Each structure stands twice: as C-alpha cells, then as structure tokens.
Amino acid sequence: MGKILVWDVPTRIGHWLLVITFTLSFITGDSEEQRLFHVAAGYAVGGILVFRIFWGIAGTRYARFVSFLFTPSEVIGYLGALVKGKPGHWLGHNPAGSYAIYILILLGIATVVSGVAAYVEIGGDWMAEVHDVLSYTMLGMVVIHILGVIVSGWAHHENLVLSMFNGYKQGKSKEAIEPSKKYWIVVPIASAILASLLVYIT
C-alpha cells in the first residue's frame, strides 16, 4: 500500500471550479446590482457540469460514471456499516457519495436551466421562484455532501479534501490511474469561460 493517483487533473480542476462558481452564483443571487455577474457565474456552472458529464463518460477510471454505479441497497448497506464503524472502502466514490454526485449534477442542471429561463423572462415570477427553490435545495445537498466527506474521511482515516487537491489516496499500485494528458487541463477551464461569455451575447 502506498500513495497512488486516483483523481486526474481535469476532475480536480472541474470540482474546484464548480465549488467557486456555485458559491459566487449563490451569494450574488439576491443582488440586482450584481445580476450580470450572477448570470455569468451560473453559465459557468452549466459549462462545468456539461464537462463533468462528458468526463464521466470519457474520463479516467474513477471519474467515469460506470465506476460508481450502485444500487439503493448498496447505499443502505454502506450507511449501515458506516454507523457501525465498519464501512467498506472504495478508492473512488463510495455508494453514498455517488448518489450525492448524481443528485448534485441533476440539481445543478435544473438550477441552471431554470435560471436561464427566468433571465430571459420565460415563466415569469413562477420560474424565478422555481430557480430559488432549486438553488437552496442544491445548497442543502452541498452541505450534506460536505458532511459526508467529513464523516467518510474520519471513518477511513483519510484526508479526502487533500486528495481532491493533489489527486492521491492510499492504495495498491495496480489500482492507480495513469496521469491524464496535460492538454485536458484546458477543458474545464475553457468550458467555464466560454459558458460565462454567453451571457454577453444573448
């Protein structure tokens, strides 16, 4: 057992860009003066989510959706074992974490779509209310995700936040991924920037 690469560069950059852009979009949501900034951040969130879906299909081993497809019974079993202090260990996303990711992606897409609709005045006040509800629901899911990371990290004696920065976790060498091509670094960044620029041409 030793330190092995689990999270590739695009996954890590995409993750932290999503953290930043969602935070910016949320804290500027109620400010009329910062409305354009809010919309730009929202477009960036959308662009990053599009990239994440793509990377979930074409990315490296632990970034792919097929590596964290779990049944509800597996999630319940994992949570039960976690409560007993004997949770199973996954190098990639664990069963509970995988569901949080899927929910966050779906909520994120719904929030962005409703936000765009409200911005172009489709649906009127009703759509704006839907957007607000989805935004706060996503915030709640983010909080649950963070708590899950803390509990899982404590249970497995891992620094999961650090691993999402440097990409490394404890594991066997045969379980490591190959470093992704450096040019992939520009993909999540370009997605965020290009999506943000859309606000100025629509």
Locate each region found by the language model.
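Membrane-embedded alpha-helical bundles that constitute the cytochrome b-like, heme-associated redox core
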Residues: 1-202
